[in-house]
Amino acid sequence: MKLLSVCAIALLAAQAAGASIKHMLNGFTLMEHSDPAKRELLQKYVTWDEKSLFVNGERIMIFSGEVHPFRLPVPSLWLDVFQKIKALGFNCVSFYVDWALLEGKPGEYRAEGNFALEPFFDVAKQAGIYLLARPGPYINAEASGGGFPGWLQRVNGTLRTSDPAYLKATDNYIAHVAATIAKGQITNGGPVILYQPENEYSGACCDATFPDGDYMQYVIDQARNAGIVVPLINNDAWTGGHNAPGTGKGEVDIYGHDSYPLGFDCGHPSVWPKGNLPTTFRTDHLKQSPTTPYSLIEFQAGSFDPWGGPGFAACAALVNHEFERVFYKNDLSFGAAILNLYMTFGGTNWGNLGHPGGYTSYDYGSPLTESRNVTREKYSELKLIGNFVKASPSYLLATPGNLTTSGYADTADLTVTPLLGNGTGSYFVVRHTDYTSQASTPYKLSLPTSAGRLTVPQLGGTLTLNGRDSKIHVVDYNVAGTNIIYSTAEVFTWKNFGDSKVLILYGGPGEHHELAVSLKSDVQVVEGSNSEFKSKKVGDVVVVAWDVSPSRRIVQIGDLKIFLLDRNSVYNYWVPQLDKDDSSTGYSSEKTTASSIIVKAGYLVRTAYTKGSGLYLTADFNATTPVEVIGAPSNVRNLYINGEKTQFKTDKNGIWSTEVKYSAPKIKLPSMKDLDWKYLDTLQEVQSTYDDSAWPAADLDTTPNTLRPLTTPKSLYSSDYGFHTGYLIYRGHFVADGSETTFDVRTQGGSAFGSSVWLNESFLGSWTGLNANADYNSTYKLPQVEQGKNYVLTILIDTMGLNENWVVGTDEMKNPRGILSYKLSGRDASAITWKLTGNLGGEDYQDKIRGPLNEGGLYAERQGFHQPQPPSQKWKSASPLDGLSKPGIGFYTAQFDLDIPSGWDVPLYFNFGNSTKSAYRVQLYVNGYQYGKFVSNIGPQTSFPVPQGILNYQGTNWVALTLWALESDGAKLDDFELVNTTPVMTALSKIRPSKQPNYRQRKGAY
């Protein structure tokens, strides 16, 4: 700790008042921390001006993808995701941390194994990816409770406010998680360059103080006190200016906001609502935070999907490649310097970690699928945009202008937004004025260039903007010292390979394009056809015009080779950095970008490095693929692909070419229906001999829950007793007086929940669920009861996660789970005494490896039978495909072996038949991890991907199912299969399985 001088204390006071330290560099104002102790650490690492961040003194555009490590509980797969994001041209990943998974019991912070952050930091560094850390404490994220642990329902204070009880509840978590993040900061050699306190702190109701500077300052101070010294950034839910620099107490260093402009209506994926394209972001930014780089911390890259929704394939169609072309280029038109796409890889809501508004899959329609595939066209389109930005540092120096329908394009049907450089290059973003238009619009452009104002095309013809498309036309674009006066075709990338320069341009089908280059040399077509191609020299300028074709053309002008491609062809090109060795990939910088090569190779290129006289590529293939290397270093002679020396040819343009043969292995998967299934009745609670004396008594006279007063004599809110996840079971005991004829009960489990009720062994009925219902009131007719006899009501509730808490003051997260009210006809409610259970131990959860949310309250779960090697030898043999003949819950377990060949990434899925018969619910456990909740009558999910590492691809696996029949005729699985999709020949390192502890008898299990 440093003793602060009087001046330093004055600076701290200035910071509290909203001041900042400024100095000038190359005409731009750099902003640094006003705390000199922190500035001493930061000034050479992460600073910023009004244009962009500087990292290690270099101006950098942050192009980032959102990834949640907790949604992929196989740390050895994180590198795969990072490398696929790096291949997009991105340089950063943003991540949330889910508090509920790390502090399942108040005061006990556990971040080990799959939940440890350090391995995430390590692989980010290995992949050359910076990190934006977003640990909350509130994260939203479509996570149960918005990331809040269930025990916060008992906190006597308003959440996300400066209420002392809430602040105290957050202290332990933030102290630990922020300290871990601090160790991973760039100042300590780690990848973390930004930290976000809180999340979408943007609105309030219900008399909550908002914005509450004291609250935000407390969250900021928590982080700083734990060692966070990187700049703090926020994500306002809209352009509200909350907590922007200069707003006073609770202000962040860099203001950012979110935007989901297309909304979440995946049921109508082709509908783009009128007026949803942002047009004022630049103006808003200049009003709210003109001294910081324009930052979009969450911009839409997909959509959530509710229970009963159309499915994530429809969400991927809604936020598709066309969306990316129009909306992301629109973001660039505002001068976005920090752009994070939510989600870039979604993952899975395994182990009950999701909120009630979503199901097991968190695919999100993202560029990377839930199973980590990169087969969606939107991934390829995003790669074009990402690599363009990476190759265009002058973009950050250009000043965004006002959009206009006149002055640049010759038709008002098009809108142009200029980003004008001062001798450093300009960019013109063109879109349809009606952004929803699907028309093909011809146009010409009037462009201000270093050669004067030019109307293009100059050599005849017109340009075309197809429907739901957008283009970035460059002017005075620097390609290693060669000035591209203009190009109407879009830039993918360019490289300087010493003796030659390469520029890759592309256009859409049926388009005509033109470029002008400041060179005196003649034009040569060195590859491809001369047809539909023309050129003309005008003084010291060469003008080239062509029609886009699927066949590649290479045009040479002096030492510049220009590749003219169509969009679908350029999807197969990659720009890996050329690393020094195979141990890690450097962070994106001017140097590493300049050292990159260009590879045409189909599915995926991960890395490239040189060793001795060899060029080594690591790449994945899903088909026999021609491979080309453009710009191989002059000192290498040999080519290795995935470690194998590969013969190649060199053409007249110096391009290496070879072919990688693909022959998919035969993947033999076990038949699920033919496994040796063992069966156990897992609703033993309805048996007349069942003893619940070991169960917790629901005997609280009051509830600490401040949201909803009790409407029962004793609290029946599950979180009051430490049960926050999965299935709940209640047992209500009463002595009949003979007057009881009906039982009315209101249960609450969240959207799409279900419940069933028994009186002794008599099934009374079920609420089978609807997405629209978070709670439901049911009335059941009782069989004849005998006066003086003991009876037990057994109520089973499937909880779907806790509500999020997005609006401050609502305390929605405190919406209880369990029984809200009940009425036994003819009796006072106090005539029933209750017991309840959820997962064994509640907050003293048994399975520290799989975490506090993974298992619920069924008998088999409480015993741990869902784990590998349960004591099933003497259990009955029965199959879930035969199922149950009456209401209840069956537990089925079986083992099987897999022998998936190494060197292949083979996505595996458990598929359920889509039944239209009686309603039932299934939980899928794989090697102890709950990896699926299937609800037959609601859907939409029927296919559940389970990653390698949860599944043992070379070894023994255990699968367990809980089958809950909600209706009187029972239920069975129509079908249940393990299937694979296309095997990918991969360079991915060996996958280490996540820990899968076997069954051990649990002390105190009931």
UniProtKB/Swiss-Prot annotation:
Record GO cellular component, one term: extracellular region
Reaction(s) catalysed by this chain's protein: Hydrolysis of terminal non-reducing beta-D-galactose residues in beta-D-galactosides
Entry function: Cleaves beta-linked terminal galactosyl residues from gangliosides, glycoproteins, and glycosaminoglycans.
Underlying gene: lacA
Residues that hold substrate according to the record: Y96, N140, A141, E142, N199, Y260, Y364
Organism: Aspergillus fumigatus (strain ATCC MYA-4609 / CBS 101355 / FGSC A1100 / Af293) (Neosartorya fumigata)
Family to which the UniProt record says this protein belongs: Belongs to the glycosyl hydrolase 35 family.
Signal peptide: 1-18
GO biological process, one term: galactose catabolic process
Residues carrying covalently attached carbohydrate according to the record: N156, N373, N402, N422, N622, N760, N777, N914
Record's subcellular location: Secreted
The name this protein goes by in its record: Probable beta-galactosidase A
Active site: E200, E298
Keywords of the record: Carbohydrate metabolism, Disulfide bond, Glycoprotein, Glycosidase, Hydrolase, Polysaccharide degradation, Secreted, Signal
PANTHER family listed in its UniProt record: BETA-GALACTOSIDASE RELATED (PTHR23421)
